[in-house]
Amino acid sequence: MEESFWKQTYEKILIGMGLFGITLKFLFLNQILPFIGARLLFTGFRKLRSENRWLKAGYAGAALEVVITIVTIVLGSVLEREKIYALYAWKGIDFCGGILPVVLMICLFLGMREELEQRDEKIKSEVLLHIIIWYAVVTVLAIQEYEGWILGFVIVAAYIGILVELKNIAEKLEEAGYVLEEHSVRISDSRCAAGAAILTAAGLFVGYTCFGAYHMEWTTANETQDPACEETKAHLLSLGFPDDILHDLKKEDILACKNARQVLLNQSDDSLRGRDGQLQLDGLAVELEQEGQWKVIHHFLWNGNPGFRGTEAVQINPAYQELNGGWTSQGKLTGQVLYDKDGTSYTADYKILQDENYDTGMNAFFYGSQQNASIFAEFSLPRSGENCRGYVAYEIKAKESDWWIDSWLNYTHQKTIWQYPVISAAQNRRQGGWLDERVFSTVQDALQVLPEGENEGSIGS
């Protein structure tokens, strides 16, 4: 026996609601299932929009759900989407997206009840009460950030139970003689689905290509002519400071090294290879004029093309980080990024340069989150240009003598555009580097020197 048009329609709506209630965070199902669910809800309520006011309201809500779902998926391709999430406008949109599935359930129930009443059929309102209680419980658990399995299964079972109750009402409506007539439409369901898919794909393309990396404020690098700065440069060169690295330093970092006592250098033999380029890492420790005070400098240089240019990150575990160690932090973090193009050098500050404490989810299932602290420098390289390079510097002061300056660096390079949702190289490090090899590549280096001048080669991997 051929299914009625009404049965095809309400089953489509119930399946759409079911897909919205499923959260599977693998194989992109967390995005695919809601997208399919929104499309089914829209096409289902579209056929009911002329029946009564409640079903017409459901059609409007389903259309809004499609838009919110598409926007949510597209935002996954935007690197700095957290800024959008922080806007009050988005919080309102997010709230609407969260409550709409429940609103659609209520609209379907009230719409079917109205049709039954027109046929002198009565139904109880327990389903409506069940929907409200279910949503209230889910809201409370979300506010409390509940992550347990037991209540999770109960919530899913209750959700399925509500859908079954709605299905029973739909069957009762059909038994009461309700017949849904199929009306002609100018745009078919398949074209609506194709349009939504194309719009989503176009949004993802724009997100990846235009907003998948940091927007850096590049300016022409001007060589300083300050006499004091030139005098300090000459003094540093006499102590063995590499000339190429010296020319990359900011004026404030050069002047901070006035009357420096000594320069200790580590040059790494380890490298991170790009498409046809190689990353060189160097570490320097400069003892400043005040005895026991040092400036630590980590410098990087891409010799050649690094390949894909998405996001980069320099993560430093500084010498002062060691618990009960011999060093304390002194002063602020400094640094910049540079590149050359057509004989001109350009420079920009890091998009983010900060010393931060953070939690990593690595092994969180078994051991819980882990507390970490690092210096992070986050940036993006220009789409064209050569000799891409930069440095991060910080100052330390000795608490005790005879302590090694032990400063570790992780340089992370994004090597492909193919990731979803988009995260930065620094976010990958904060999460324990779980996307290393597939999306990112990381190389490690260390500056390990003794203040007396005894030097041990850098350690990398």
Regions found by a protein language model. Give the residues of each.
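Structured domain cores in non-transmembrane regions
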Residues: 72-75, 79-83, 91-99, 304-385
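N-terminal topogenic module of multi-pass integral membrane proteins
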Residues: 1-44
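Cytosolic juxtamembrane helix at the C-terminal end of the final transmembrane segment
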Residues: 46-48, 105-126, 158-185
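A eukaryote-biased signal for long
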Residues: 203-227, 361-461
